[in-house]
């Protein structure tokens, strides 16, 4: 039996808990063919398109608290990356060049020649690749809460305890098989510890952590897919070294939580672009859209205002 054309149940909008009031009046889950993969995206709103790229170990659901406000001005597209959520999980194709190409094909299918991008955590890696490899397609890009392999200066081998708690998963996730064998059946311990350590003092609600963990534990394929981007870090690092030969032409907003990476994303993005604005949100850990949705919306609204004002689609939406 083929999968339904409209996603339903766990992983989709219809199966997501504790959504903001009126969310399902604006947003729907869609399966979209993007070349050799079918991606799941949650789409809604009017105006120029805004692509939201989640991080690890999240999904489109990470953005749920900011999506309704952003949808007042933009058509919001919150995607599950290749290997994540309801999107296809092939064995290959997890370097950021391939992942960025997936998203270009996704936006092609939605009819968008140009769009803005927001990416956090591993979504920062993909968002940077998207902006660097397809600068004609990306009007503005907001990225945060991650190092860029091959660009961000490497950390020393011996790190402070609080840094180890936040970042030990990066080399662990790159293992070929051992990580899956250790985590399978213990997803709540592994991923639960990751959510807790990276959140800082303002922990995520239990229902959200449970939703993410249940999705990752739902099948061996889901668990496997969650590690694949990390296993491709070697290829991504080499690609980033080549990308560094070209400066990003579009404005960049570099974001961080004060209890997490702070201004590290800005320091990294200044190595790749000339027009870089810095946002550090006080009293917030790694999960910006979960922990400070109002502050994030305000910053994105200001940063994206020139993109909105220049868009013909915004004028049509306002007139209607």
Question: Where are these predicted regions, by residue range?
Answer:
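A short, glycine- and basic residue-enriched loop/turn
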Residues: 59-60, 125, 285
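A short, charged, Gly/Pro-tolerant segment at domain boundaries
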Residues: 315-320
């Amino acid at each position: 039996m083929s999968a339904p054309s409209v996603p339903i149940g766990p992983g989709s909008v219809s199966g997501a808990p504790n959504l903001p009031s009126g969310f399902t009046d604006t947003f729907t889950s869609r399966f979209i063919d993007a070349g050799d993969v079918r991606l799941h995206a949650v789409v809604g709103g009017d105006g120029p398109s805004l692509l939201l790229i989640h991080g690890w170990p999240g999904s489109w659901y990470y953005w749920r608290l900011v999506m309704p406000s952003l949808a007042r001005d933009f058509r919001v597209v919150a995607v599950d990356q290749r290997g994540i959520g309801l999107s296809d999980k092939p064995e290959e194709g997890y370097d950021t060049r391939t992942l960025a190409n997936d998203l270009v094909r996704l936006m092609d299918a939605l009819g968008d020649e140009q769009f803005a991008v927001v990416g956090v955590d591993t979504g920062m890696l993909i968002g940077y690749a998207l902006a660097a490899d397809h600068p004609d397609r990306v009007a503005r890009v907001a990225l945060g809460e991650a190092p860029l392999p091959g660009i961000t200066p490497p950390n020393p081998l011996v790190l402070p305890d609080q840094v180890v708690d936040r970042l030990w998963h990066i080399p662990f996730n790159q293992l070929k098989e051992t990580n899956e064998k250790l985590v399978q059946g213990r997803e709540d311990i592994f991923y639960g510890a990751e959510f807790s350590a990276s959140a800082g003092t303002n922990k995520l609600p239990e229902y959200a952590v449970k939703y993410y963990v249940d999705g990752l534990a739902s099948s061996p394929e889901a668990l496997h897919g969650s590690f694949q981007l990390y296993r491709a870090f070697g290829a991504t690092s080499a690609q980033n070294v080549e990308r560094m030969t070209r400066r990003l032409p579009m404005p960049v907003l570099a974001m961080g939580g004060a209890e997490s990476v702070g201004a590290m994303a800005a320091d990294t993005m200044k190595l790749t672009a000339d027009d870089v604005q810095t946002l550090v949100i006080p009293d917030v850990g790694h999960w910006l859209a979960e922990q400070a949705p109002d502050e994030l919306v305000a910053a994105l609204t200001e940063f994206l205002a020139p993109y909105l004002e220049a868009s013909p689609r915004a004028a049509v939406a306002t007139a209607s």
